[in-house]
């Protein structure tokens, strides 16, 4: 693969199988034209973008959740190399570091890539098998170092797919439709996570079968996504630069000029994800140690909450995504979603009962579903340099990972210091609220 210098290839006389190339652009606004071709997008290709995004997110979230929720933790308990919780925690902690670094690296590399298959497509394709190999090795590794190394390889493969896939929203989707496409992306993640929890639980007595199925899903994730998405334009040119390590190093500089709104979006996203994960990551313990259920009742409650989590996002994107595109606003849906999430967190804080946890699950995922609908669209709209979308979106995606890392650290500290979960709720509410307020200060989008 060759690396290029300068602006991305946008308006190129290359038609391939893209029907929108032949559509007239006269009378269309800039928001209706695809960034890479300067032409309107066809309904067929718009549908293919939606199908590709939702397929990708369902498969990668489902695959990650299938193994990590039940089969892998159960296997770690039988290895005799330490407590399962310690193994799982070490694996995730180090794996997150690789996820953080590789997301930015592959985003930058895809920005600079010059391939006849496009600048994003090759990375998405090769990421799947890398993740699949990493997961399979994790499922058979007998020692902690090999488990950690294998899981880190999975994170590299996963982010090799995520970084360029997210950048497609900026490269190839008209601004007018980004809310709707972001809706598919967000819904796919939530549905995939719920499906993974349900499917993973089914393989508690047949872990090897679950591991093989999960490995296959990982391997097919990238290629399946590429087949569903419209074909990317060639990024190869006669004057493309050969690989230059200095040129690649320059790709990793964080944006500075005109990046105020970009960093506001980063902080807002970090706070919202942090507040959201303070409760989501501890649902079982909250049910047992705060609501007062025994282990069996708590497991049943969490299982029911998973079903609620899967159903709600199926409805939200169909409504809120098109509404966001129609009204042309991103900040208002984020503020509304944050308010709903805050109310959802407050319900079990005030009312300790199983029913309050069900209400929490419904409101949390309603709010989070609305947020995910406009999240990626808002992020794309505040990019300082659209031609460096992969790198910039990779940096924004750090907020997701950091939020998930910081949340358990803070929650654990609160529980150790106070002996309970009571203070976790108001702090989570405050974090979500701060995130919403920060987003309101963005000037570049409405």
Whereabouts are the PLM-identified features?
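Helix-loop boundary and gating motifs at the non-cytosolic
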Residues: 35-96, 261-268, 272-293
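Helix-to-loop junctions at the C-terminal end of transmembrane segments
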Residues: 103-117, 316-329, 415
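A membrane-interface helix-boundary motif in multi-pass transporters
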Residues: 119-121, 202-217, 412-432
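Structural signature of the two symmetry-related core transmembrane helices
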Residues: 120-136, 332-347
């Amino acid at each position: 693969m060759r690396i290029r210098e300068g602006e991305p290839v946008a308006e190129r006389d290359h038609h391939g199988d893209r029907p929108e190339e032949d559509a007239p652009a006269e009378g269309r606004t800039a928001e209706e034209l695809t960034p890479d071709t300067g032409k309107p997008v066809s309904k067929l290709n718009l549908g293919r973008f939606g199908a590709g995004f939702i397929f990708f997110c369902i498969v990668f979230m489902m695959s990650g959740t299938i193994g990590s929720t039940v089969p892998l933790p159960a296997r770690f308990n039988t290895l005799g190399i330490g407590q399962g919780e310690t193994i799982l925690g070490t694996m995730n902690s180090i794996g997150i570091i690789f996820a953080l670094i590789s997301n930015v690296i592959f985003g930058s590399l895809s920005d600079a890539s010059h391939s006849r298959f496009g600048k994003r497509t090759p990375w998405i394709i090769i990421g799947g098998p890398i993740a699949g190999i990493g997961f399979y090795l994790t499922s058979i590794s007998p020692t902690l170092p090999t488990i950690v190394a294998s899981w880190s390889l999975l994170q590299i493969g996963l982010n090799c797919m995520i970084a360029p896939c997210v950048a497609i929203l900026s490269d190839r989707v008209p601004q007018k439709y980004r809310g709707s496409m972001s809706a598919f992306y967000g819904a796919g993640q939530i549905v995939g996570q719920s499906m993974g929890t349900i499917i993973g639980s089914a393989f508690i007595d047949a872990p090897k079968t679950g591991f093989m199925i999960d490995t296959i899903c990982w391997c097919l994730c990238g290629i399946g996504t590429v087949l569903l998405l419209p074909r990317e334009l060639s990024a190869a040119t006669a004057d493309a630069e050969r690989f230059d390590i200095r040129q690649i190093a320059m790709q990793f500089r964080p944006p500075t000029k005109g990046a105020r709104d970009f960093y506001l979006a980063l902080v807002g996203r970090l706070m919202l994800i942090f507040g959201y994960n303070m409760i989501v990551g501890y649902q079982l313990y909250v049910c047992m140690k705060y609501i007062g259920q025994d282990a069996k009742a708590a497991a049943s409650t969490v299982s029911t909450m998973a079903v609620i989590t899967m159903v709600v996002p199926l409805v939200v994107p169909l409504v809120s995504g098109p509404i966001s595109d129609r009204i042309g606003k991103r900040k208002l849906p984020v503020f509304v979603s944050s308010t709903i999430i805050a109310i959802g967190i407050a319900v079990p804080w005030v009312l300790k009962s199983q029913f309050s946890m069900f209400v929490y699950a419904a409101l949390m995922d309603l709010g989070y579903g609305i947020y995910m609908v406009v999240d990626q669209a808002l992020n794309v709209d505040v990019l300082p340099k659209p031609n460096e979308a992969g790198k910039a979106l990779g940096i924004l995606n750090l907020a997701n990972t950091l939020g998930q890392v910081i949340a358990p650290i803070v929650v654990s500290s609160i529980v150790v210091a106070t002996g309970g979960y009571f203070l976790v709720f108001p702090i989570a509410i405050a974090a979500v609220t701060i995130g919403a307020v920060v987003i309101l200060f963005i000037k570049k989008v409405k």
